[in-house]
């Protein structure tokens, strides 16, 4: 049995959970999330806790047990507190700004790159170089942050590009001249 899957998921007061079979809907102050879980697990609710249990001892049920528990816990966390990813833009002339809901990134190309957020995701820019991606869905927030980082990944020689806040870029030595 999965150690992660054994833990009950506590529900905050403002969060409402409904499940029909393997589809689960979680509503909270930050939004509403829906997901269909894979076969092999069952969900049960007891007062302020959700329990995820494998339906049998087959390998697939055991594999999905911890995964489904983590997915449901992330949904509950997302609709109550939300998730954020912070990115830093490093380099002369590289900057970002928000126009309407669209993020416009100038990253050294001949044209600015526009990123349109999916529903529920918001972009915020601080000091033209720090981008904050927020939303209730952990997977979507991470995917959008990865898309923004992929516009200009950090290069190892000078460290220019778009990186996650706190990300360590391994630097390489440049060419050594003739002596």
Swiss-Prot record:
Q: Which gene encodes it?
A: rplF
Read off the PROSITE patterns from this record.
RIBOSOMAL_L6_1
Gene Ontology biological process terms from the UniProt entry: cytoplasmic translation
Q: Which SUPFAM superfamilies match?
A: Ribosomal protein L6 (SSF56053)
Concerning NCBIfam families, the annotation shows: L6_bact
Q: Which domain of life is it from?
A: Bacteria
Per the record's keyword annotation, is Ribosomal protein included, yes or no? yes
GO annotations of cellular component type: cytosolic large ribosomal subunit
Protein name per Swiss-Prot or TrEMBL: Large ribosomal subunit protein uL6
Q: Which UniProt keywords apply?
A: Ribonucleoprotein, Ribosomal protein, RNA-binding, rRNA-binding
Function statement? This protein binds to the 23S rRNA, and is important in its secondary structure. It is located near the subunit interface in the base of the L7/L12 stalk, and near the tRNA binding site of the peptidyltransferase center.
What does the record give under GO molecular function?
Answer: rRNA binding; structural constituent of ribosome
**Stored Pfam families:** Ribosomal_L6 (PF00347)
Question: What does the sequence similarity comment in the record state about its family?
Answer: Belongs to the universal ribosomal protein uL6 family.
Q: How does it assemble?
A: Part of the 50S ribosomal subunit.
Q: Which Gene3D superfamilies match?
A: Ribosomal protein L6, alpha-beta domain
């Amino acid at each position: 049995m999965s150690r992660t899957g054994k833990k009950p998921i506590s529900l905050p007061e403002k969060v409402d959970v409904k499940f029909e079979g393997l589809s689960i809907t979680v509503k909270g102050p930050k939004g509403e999330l829906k997901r269909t879980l894979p076969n092999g697990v069952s969900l049960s609710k007891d007062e302020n806790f959700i329990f995820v249990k494998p339906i049998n001892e087959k390998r697939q049920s055991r594999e999905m047990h911890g995964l489904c528990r983590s997915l449901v816990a992330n949904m509950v966390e997302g609709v109550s507190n939300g998730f954020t990813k912070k990115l830093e833009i490093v380099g002369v002339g590289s900057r970002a700004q928000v126009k309407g809901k669209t993020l416009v990134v100038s990253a050294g190309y001949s044209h600015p790159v526009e990123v349109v957020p999916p529903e529920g995701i918001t972009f915020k820019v601080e000091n033209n170089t720090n981008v904050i991606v927020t939303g209730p869905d952990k997977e979507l927030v991470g995917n959008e942050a990865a898309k923004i980082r992929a516009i200009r990944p950090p290069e190892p020689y000078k460290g220019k590009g778009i990186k996650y806040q706190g990300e360590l870029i391994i630097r390489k030595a440049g060419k050594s001249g003739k002596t």
